[in-house]
Every structure is written in C-alpha cells, then in structure tokens.
C-alpha cells in the first residue's frame, strides 16, 4: 500500500495536493514579518510626512503585497513546472532580465526626467520604476537564472556525466551551464553597481551546478582559491592608509567593517547601532514594540537591519525561533528537491533553496558584523513588497514540483497494481 503523504486538501485556485508544511511555514514567516515590519516602522511612519504620518503606512503596503504574493504563489503552483522548461520561455526570461537591466541606464537622463525609469540610492542604481510600480531588477533576474540554469543542466547534464575526465568539451559545457548565473550577475553588477545582488545571483548558479555535479573535487579547490583571494584582498585593504574619495563607497564599507570604531559617526553607525540592539535584547528581549534603537538610531530598521530589532525586542529566544522557521522552510524545499521526478524539477527547487539560504546567511552576517554592509534583505521579514512577491512566485514553482512529482508517483503506483 502506498505511503500516505501529508498534503493539503485546499482547493484554492484548484490547488489540491500541495505541501501543507511548506504553505504553513511560509504563512508563519509572512505573519512574523508583518508584525516586525509594523513594530520596526510605526514610530518613523508616525513622524514622517512622506508616510502621511500614518503609523501603519508600511504595514498596509507590506500586507497588500503579501496578499498579492500569496495569490501569485498559488497561481504559479498550478502551472506545470515543465512549462518553465520550454526553450522559448527560458530565452524570454533571460532576454527580459537583460532588458530590465539595460533600463537602469536611463539614469543618465537625471533624477526627475520623464525618460529616467531608474532609482539610485547609496551609490547603487538597483530599482526600475514604471508609474507607481517599482522593483529591484535583481529579483526577476534571480528567477531567470534559476530557470535557465535548471534548463541547461537538464539539457547538457547527461552528456557531461558520461565524460570521465575534465576534457575541453567538459569545460565548454561547464561554461555554458554557468553562463546565466555568472553572465547575468556580471552584467547586473556593471550596470547597476549592485554587487551584493550580483554576488548572490552568481553563487546561485554555482551552487546549483555544484549540487548536481558528481565530480566535486574541483569545486572544493575553486572554493579554497576564492577564499584565499578574499583573504588576501581584505589583508591588503587593512594595510592601506586612509580611504580616499576616489576609492568609492564599497572600499569604504570594507574599511568600516574592518575598523568600525574609526567610522562610527558615518559608515559604521548603523552597524554599531544594530550590534547595540542585539546586545541589549538579552535572552527574552525588551518586549514587542519596545525597541530603543529604532527611534532614530537605525535609519531604516524595517529594511535590511530588521533582524537587529527582532533580537532587541524578542531576544535570543525570538531570534532563534525565526531561524528555526527558516531552517524548516529550507528543509521542506530540500525534501521536495530530493523527491522531484526529474532533474529539471530538482534543479528548480535547488535554485530556490540556494537563493533563500544565501540571503538569510548574508543578511544575518551583515547585522551581526560578520560581513560588510551589503543591503541584502531578510526574505519574507524585511519590508519590500515586490521582493516578497517574486520570492513567493519561486515558492509557487517549488510547490508545483512537489505536486507533479507526487502525481507521477501515484500514477506509477496505480500502474504497478494493474500489472
């Protein structure tokens, strides 16, 4: 008798047989995020004219986008994931990513010009804006990289596995498979100066290839070489003298990370305030809504530094609960990837897994001072409506991988019974 699987019986938008656990943990994270966005933002919203002096301004925006994202997730979960395997879909996704990245170049027209569809902040042009709709270009690019890399691995992977040694053909296929991640990441980094998102996009492609490839020794060597280069770079930067204006804000951020108290009034101010927030929270925190650091110390506590407010208000216990929810979310995605009926579905789920895991690790590393400030948000928790929508679309893809894989297993079981 077939093993009874834990699947939902929801019929919303025809979604029968979806992974209940993944849906529930996603809902918990969204609700947790809404609570923390309100707690972190209500003070600033209530005293800011741009927010209409409405303490619930950002909460209402985030709640609306979360609802839109959940509808999009359920809709995408009804689309057979093999649709994303069609060549024209892959090419369209990559072409659209390139086009949206090129739109960022309209910044040359200057702020306020009708032909400028980009927004620049802190030295990086990350956003495109069409009317009242704005979003980070990196978000759709991440989806395009996941889809394109999955398609290439599915198309060329079987061919590469047959080769016993790293021949020229092997390297050529490897370059082709890594091209979407590395290529689009480099293109985005050059055009937008958004190096943190570019790094995430490139690593997503590499992780997907590493997760699939049976010959892992070369990747361990590459990782060691990369770590060594980063170490040398940090050492060289730490030995230099004062930072010149020409060196740019990125190098300044690295210097501020290495020696935060020399930059405590400018570049390191937010990072140090975040550490004070984390340290003052203790085991159980000051209580929801009782943060002191959000009262002007941390400029935008509802964005990429929201984890520090979680620690201050809910303490180690609250932060641990949040991390456990993320771990369980990643576990569900990993489980779906392992049980996918084919390589393409497995790679789709792996790509989403790597995206979420990378952002969680990088965000918490920045907030705790383990990395320089990158501007990477905490998935489903930080304020950011369009980022939430795109991430929920990715989770919709994962839900469909589980749905169709389970359907295929059920069909195989029925066929076995009739034999």
Q: What is the meaning of each model-derived region?
A:
Residues 89-95, 175-188, 195-242:
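Hydrophobic alpha-helical segments of polytopic membrane proteins
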Residues 112-113, 119-127, 220-318, 343-344:
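Hydrophobic, glycine- and aromatic-enriched re-entrant/interface helices and adjoining loop segments
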Residues 2-21, 45-192, 364, 368-377, ...:
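Membrane-helix boundary/helix-loop-helix interface segments in multi-pass membrane proteins
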Residues 34-37, 73, 146, 150, ...:
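Alpha-helical transmembrane segments of polytopic integral membrane proteins
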Residues 27-44:
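Alpha-helical transmembrane segments of multi-pass membrane proteins
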Residues 19-26, 88-93, 343-351:
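Membrane-interfacial loop-to-transmembrane alpha-helix junctions, especially the N-terminal start
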Residues 316-360:
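Hydrophobic transmembrane alpha-helices and their immediate junctions
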Residues 199-218, 292-314, 318, 377-389:
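Interfacial segments of multi-pass membrane proteins
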């Amino acid at each position: 008798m077939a093993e009874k699987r834990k699947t939902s019986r929801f019929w919303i938008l025809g979604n029968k047989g979806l992974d209940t656990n993944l849906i529930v943990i996603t809902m918990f994270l969204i609700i947790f995020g809404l609570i923390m966005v309100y707690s972190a933002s209500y003070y600033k919203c209530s005293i800011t004219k741009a927010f209409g002096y409405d303490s619930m301004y950002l909460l209402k925006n985030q709640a609306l986008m979360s609802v839109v994202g959940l509808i999009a997730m359920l809709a995408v979960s009804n689309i057979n994931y093999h649709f994303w395997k069609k060549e024209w879909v892959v090419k369209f996704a990559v072409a659209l990513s390139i086009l949206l990245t090129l739109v960022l170049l309209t910044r040359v027209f200057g702020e306020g010009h009708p032909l400028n569809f980009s927004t620049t902040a802190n030295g990086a042009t990350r956003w495109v804006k069409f009317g009242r709709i704005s979003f980070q270009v990196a978000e759709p690019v991440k989806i395009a990289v996941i889809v394109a890399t999955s398609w290439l691995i599915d198309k060329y992977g079987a061919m590469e596995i047959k080769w016993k040694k790293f021949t020229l053909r092997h390297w050529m296929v490897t370059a082709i498979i890594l091209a979407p991640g590395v290529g689009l990441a480099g293109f985005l980094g050059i055009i937008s100066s958004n190096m943190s998102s570019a790094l995430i996009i490139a690593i997503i492609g590499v992780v997907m290839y590493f997760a699939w490839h049976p010959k892992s020794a070369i990747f361990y060597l590459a990782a060691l070489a990369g770590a060594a280069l980063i170490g040398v770079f940090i050492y060289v930067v730490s030995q230099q003298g004062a930072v010149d204006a020409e060196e740019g804000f990125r190098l300044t951020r690295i210097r501020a990370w290495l020696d935060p108290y020399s930059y405590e009034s400018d570049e390191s101010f937010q990072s140090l305030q975040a550490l004070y927030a984390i340290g003052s929270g203790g085991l159980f925190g000051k209580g929801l809504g009782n943060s002191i650091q959000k009262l002007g110390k941390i400029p935008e506590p509802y964005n990429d530094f929201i984890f520090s407010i979680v620690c201050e208000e809910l303490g180690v216990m609250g932060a641990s609960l949040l991390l456990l929810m993320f771990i369980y979310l990643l576990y569900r995605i990993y489980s779906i990837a392992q049980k996918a009926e084919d390589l393409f579905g497995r790679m789709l789920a792996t790509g989403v897994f790597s995206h979420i895991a990378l952002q969680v690790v990088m965000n918490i590393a920045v907030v705790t001072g383990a990395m320089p400030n990158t501007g990477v948000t905490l998935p489903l928790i930080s304020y950011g409506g369009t980022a939430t929508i795109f991430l929920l679309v990715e989770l919709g893809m994962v839900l469909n991988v589980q749905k169709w894989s389970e359907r295929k297993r059920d069909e195989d079981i029925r066929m076995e019974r009739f034999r």
